Structures are given as structure tokens and as C-alpha cells.
Amino acid sequence: MSFIDSMKLDFVGHLFGIRNRGLATACCAVAVASAIAFPYIRRDYQTFLSGGPSYAPQNIKGYLIVCVLALFRQEQKGLAIYDRLPEKRRWLPDLPPRNGPRPITTSHIIQRQRNQAPDSKFALEELKATVIPRVQARHTDLTHLSLSKFEFHAEAIFLLPSVPIDDPKNVPSHDTVRRTKREIAHMHDYHDFTLHLALAAQDGKEVVAKGWGQRHPLAGPGVPGPPTEWTFIYAPRNEEELAVVEMIIEASIGYMTNDPAGTVIV
């Protein structure tokens, strides 16, 4: 150790009343590491805030929550996981590939899209507060609208409380409906116009493979989060993409209500 380094440690020890040279070294190392990490933490916190309202409050407490949950993050675009799930039916036809590369998404558990935003005029006229109610209106016998239990700020489609979920004749014989608390789909139309919804395994595989979405970062077996079937859908940018997204929402409703129409055994 150089004379200057020794003087620095003596100064740290004197400043904080620390007489143990090893403890002073540790305190100095922590201070340096904190100074290096602070700019990254500040940028990361701003990224968290830019994700908009969610289940985590937009403050330091919410940021710490998502940082802890990030320890359980799963990969989101692999396809093999779907073939290990018991549901082999499909409610979606073959989808066209989505144009262009996938959008950049947030690195946080609060899943949002960071680029490829829809045009503001299209978003306001065709997406905001219209897509979810319009699709749900076709299924009022089995679904209703309520505030999302995942996002707290989004209107969501739910399976009606009157539909029993313990009878496999009414809902699929797995725990997806139970784990989502009957929630089927919601759109973040207060922020980036992306969606979260539940899809049958083979429909989820089709959506991810064709570039229309990816799994939630906490979705997967053995993870304290939503079921594997919980899927993030990228924001539609035009009428053609909106038609595909509405088709995906319809498939989500079909799966969660166990609608026999249009199913295909694969």
C-alpha cells in the first residue's frame, strides 16, 4: 500500500471515528462502489418511472419491489416451454409474421414497449379506451369488464364470477384462470397501448414465434408470478396489426372460457 493510500484510509478512519484499518478499507470500498453505481441506479430509476403506472407505486418503494422481483426474471421468447404444457388445443389460426424487428422492451418487471409506438392520432382514435370494451362486448354471456388486478390502472376483461372454475367443462383443466384471478386480458391504453393476456400454450407459441409478443418476465413454472400463459402483446401500429391483435384477444377469451368453437387439436 502506498503512503498516499495509507493516508486516505487514515483520513476515512478519522472522519468516521473508525480505528480499525480493515474496517476503514471496507468503508472506503463501499463509498467508491456507491459513487460508481449511483449514475446507473439513477438512470435505472428514471427508466422505471417512464414505464408509467402499474402495480408497483411510482416511488423508491415501488422501485425496490421491482428490483427484488427481477431476481426471478425468466427468458421470454423461447418456444420449447409451450410444448411441455398440457393444453394442446389452439384458438388462433396461423398468424402472419409481424413486420420488422421486435420492439425494444423495458428491462424491468414492469413490462412496457420503448419504441415502435403507434401514431398518436391512430392511438387516440382507434386504441384508447376502445379495443378491450369492443372485443368484450361480443362475449357478455361469459365475461365482464373491471379494473385489472395486475395493473390497477387498466380496464380488463374477466371471466364472470358466475362461471364455476372447478368444473373442466366450463374452463380449461389447469390453474390459469385461478392464477390470473379470472382476468383474461387488459391493454395499457393509458401508456403505450401494449397488452397482457392469457393464451393457450400453442397460441402463445404462435404469437411469440411470429413476433407479435413475448412472455411476461415472471411467467413460468416455479416462479412467484403469473402463469406461463400470461403474454405481452406489442402495440398495434395500424389497422392491419389491430385486426391481428383483436384476433389474439378473441383467442384469449376462447381459451379462458373453454369455448369449443374453432379449436384445433395439435
Swiss-Prot record:
Catalytic activity, EC: 1.-.-.-
Top EC class, one word: oxidoreductase
TM stretches of this protein: 22-41
One protein family per Pfam: Luciferase
Membrane topology note: Single-pass membrane protein
Main location: membrane
Keywords attached to this entry: Membrane, Oxidoreductase, Transmembrane, Transmembrane helix
Biotechnology: The availability of a complete eukaryotic luciferin biosynthesis pathway provides several applications in biomedicine and bioengineering.
Superkingdom per UniProt: Eukaryota
Protein's cellular compartments: Membrane
GO cellular component, one term: membrane
Catalysed conversion reaction: 3-hydroxyhispidin + O2 = (E)-caffeoylpyruvate + hnu + CO2; 3-hydroxyhispidin + O2 = 4-[(E)-2-(3,4-dihydroxyphenyl)ethenyl]-1,7-dihydroxy-2,3,5-trioxabicyclo[2.2.2]oct-7-en-6-one
Gene Ontology terms for molecular function: oxidoreductase activity
UniProt record similarity statement: Belongs to the fungal luciferase family.
Physiological role: Luciferase; part of the gene cluster that mediates the fungal bioluminescence cycle. Uses the fungal luciferin 3-hydroxyhispidin as a substrate to produce an endoperoxide as a high-energy intermediate with decomposition that yields oxyluciferin (also known as caffeoylpyruvate) and light emission. The fungal bioluminescence cycle begins with the hispidin synthetase that catalyzes the formation of hispidin which is further hydroxylated by the hispidin-3-hydroxylase, yielding the fungal luciferin 3-hydroxyhispidin.
PANTHER family in the record: AMINO ACID PERMEASE_ SLC12A DOMAIN-CONTAINING PROTEIN
This protein's name: Luciferase
